UniProtKB/Swiss-Prot annotation:
The keyword DNA-binding applies. Keywords: DNA-binding, Transcription, Transcription regulation. This is Putative HTH-type transcriptional regulatory protein PAE1627. SMART domains: HTH_XRE. It comes from Pyrobaculum aerophilum (strain ATCC 51768 / DSM 7523 / JCM 9630 / CIP 104966 / NBRC 100827 / IM2).
Length: 250
């Protein structure tokens, strides 16, 4: 199935952007690097999100923050359950989405729903919700009754303290419009914690890569991919060219 998804993804890249790098010889942390308009993306294609290991996630994050290229994982399912169109799955700040959702994103339609621990939710723009509720002449209690939630829940939506589950979010969208929700940004590099950096650090601003063509990545006044494997060296050079980095032999 991954071959079918990969071919479909490559068709989207061909029709909507430019393929800068690809290697499907084995499952690396990434499958390809693509460019859509001015933005480059490091992309992994897998049937299920569980096929992308935690070490691959760390590699993606390190590559992203050092090359300023966001990471996107294109998958069909999460833990065996179909990932719906318009819903993204966030794992350690790396975005997973279906190919249909990616197509929507490329057409300018940003996703608003996210999957977390089996529950689909949306982030509500609290200020807009409060303004539109007041414009409609609705009290907190009345809106809560219409939504089937407590007054306290609506109050917390307006303060941005909690996200709304799918059905409640859909009710709010029907009442006040889609701009009541916050769009999920997919063109930003994932956040990397100091603990994650420390777990991979092998030198000054140098970090080990475990599921990539280069063995490490470092930052001086530029991004450098470090290669000690002769068999992977050529692909490391191709990856560096795609991401605007340089290569250094270990």
């Amino acid at each position: 199935m991954v071959d079918k998804l990969l071919n479909a993804t490559l068709n989207v890249v061909k029709n909507r952007g430019e393929q800068l790098f690809i290697d499907v010889a084995r499952p690396y942390a990434y499958t390809l690097v693509a460019k859509f308009d001015r933005d480059k993306y490091i992309m992994r294609v897998a049937t299920d999100a569980e096929q992308v290991s935690q070490s691959a996630i760390k590699d993606l994050k390190l590559l992203s923050i050092h090359t300023n290229a966001p990471s996107i994982c294109v998958v069909s399912s999460v833990k065996g359950h179909l990932l719906q169109r318009g819903v993204v799955y966030l794992r350690d700040d790396v975005v997973f989405m279906s190919l249909a959702t990616l197509t929507d994103v490329l057409e300018g339609k940003k996703p608003i729903f996210k999957l977390n621990r089996g529950v689909i939710t949306a982030s509500i723009d609290g200020e807009k919700l409060r303004a539109k509720r007041q414009q409609a002449g609705l009290s907190l209690g009345t809106l809560a009754t219409n939504l089937g939630v407590t007054r306290e829940t609506v109050y917390r939506y307006e303060r941005g303290e909690i996200e709304a589950p799918l059905k409640i979010a859909e009710k709010l969208i029907n009442m006040f419009g889609e701009d009541i929700t916050k769009k999920i940004k997919i063109n930003e590099t994932p956040k990397v914690s100091q603990e994650e950096l420390a777990s991979r650090q092998i030198g000054a601003k140098t970090y080990r890569l475990l599921e990539s063509h280069p063995d490490a990545i470092k930052w001086e006044d530029r991004t450098i991919l470090i290669s000690s494997n002769a068999e992977r060296y050529q692909k490391t050079v191709e990856l560096a060219n795609a991401l605007g980095a340089e290569v250094e032999r270990a």
